[in-house]
Structures are given as C-alpha cells and as structure tokens.
Design a protein with these regions (language model features):
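C-terminal substrate-recognition "lid" of short-chain dehydrogenase/reductases
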Residues: 169-195
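Active-site loop-to-helix junction immediately N-terminal to the catalytic Tyr of the SDR YXXXK motif
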Residues: 43-46, 98-106, 118, 146
C-alpha cells in the first residue's frame, strides 16, 4: 500500500510514481474516497438555503475532487499514454435518487456519475474504460445514528429508505467486490464503459 491524500495532487502524483516504479504499468484505478459532510445535511433546524458554501465545497472536494477528478487526472494520464486501462469510481444511489437529506453528498455523487460518463466517452478512443458502481445504503459510523435506534431497530428514516430499496435491506461493503472485479477486468467487461 501507498498512503496518499486523494484531495492533494502532489500526494497522488507521489503515490502514482511509487506504484509505477514498483509494479510497472497501472491497469486499474478504483476511486473510493468519499463521505458525507454532516454540516451539509438538511435537518429540521438546517434548511438547504442555510447550508454554508464551505460545507458544500467540503462535500464536493471529498466526493468529486478526491473521489474521482484528481485521481483520474493523475492515473488517467498514464493510461492514456499506454492506450489502455480501467477506472471504477464509487458513486452512490444518492446521486440518482435523493432518498435522504444529505443534499451536498447527493449532488456531489451525481457529479461523480456525470464525470464518469464524460470520461468514458472522452477516453474510449484511448482504450480506457471508465465506469461507476452505484451502491445503495450501507450502515457506517457516519450514518449509524440516523439509521438505527439504540436498541438496534431501524429508525423511521431507515425504514423509509428500506421501503424504497428492492432488496429491503442495507448492503454490506463486501458485496461491492464482485462488481469492482467485473468492471476492472477487460476479459469480463471489455465492452462496458460509462455505467
């Protein structure tokens, strides 16, 4: 592993250099940086029109800039030069359907989806496939209090989300591995781009 800050271009360039030197060509990039900005979440006391620009910016910096834009620029440059590669950006169902009140996160993930589709079209002639995985809701520390009561039962908000989830359950992070492997593999998904 090479530790880097996905929101810092110098850190990404260092990581790319170390990885390229150690392993040679970089064939696959999976961008998984992201998360919610609690100060950009609508509540009964915080309306969308009251969210500060800095909090919107924090959500976009983490999810779009660090979660797709900068890593794609840094690692994509090598892929363009060699004429092949696969990039997988982690998006969110929130980028398609605003099921909860995480407005800045949802907007930023929608931007990730659009950016993914743009790069897929832009880099297709260079032999680079760019896709996104759009997971549903996954319980994590950042949203556990919003989803579960102290006794472990779903909150009304969680139940509302589950009611709009075809499988009627929350996901597990390990369930994304197969999709990432599929989209990374030229043999399995060589004709798939822009998803």
């Amino acid at each position: 592993f090479v530790k880097c800050n996905a929101m810092n271009i110098e850190s990404l360039e260092y990581a790319q250099s170390v990885l390229h030197e150690k392993f040679g060509d970089i064939d696959v990039l999976i961008n998984a940086a992201g998360g919610n900005q609690p100060k950009a979440t609508v509540t009964d006391r915080l309306l969308v029109e009251d969210i500060k620009l800095v909090d919107w910016s924090d959500a976009f910096d983490l999810n779009l800039v660090g979660g797709a834009l900068l890593p794609c620029q840094v690692f994509g440059r090598l892929m363009v030069e060699k004429g092949s590669g696969s990039i997988v950006n982690i998006a969110s169902i929130a980028g398609h359907i605003p099921l909860s009140r995480v407005v800045a996160y949802s907007a930023a993930k929608a931007a990730v989806i659009n950016f993914t589709q743009f790069l897929a079209r832009e880099w297709a002639s260079n032999g680079i496939r760019v896709n996104s995985i759009t997971p549903g809701f996954f319980p994590a520390e950042q949203n556990r209090n919003l989803l579960f009561e102290e006794d472990g039962t779903p909150t009304p908000r969680a139940q509302q989300i589950l009611d709009h989830t075809p499988l009627n359950r929350f996901g597990n992070a390990n369930e994304l591995v197969g999709a990432a492997v599929f989209l990374s593999s030229t043999m399995a998904s060589g004709f798939v781009t822009g998803t």
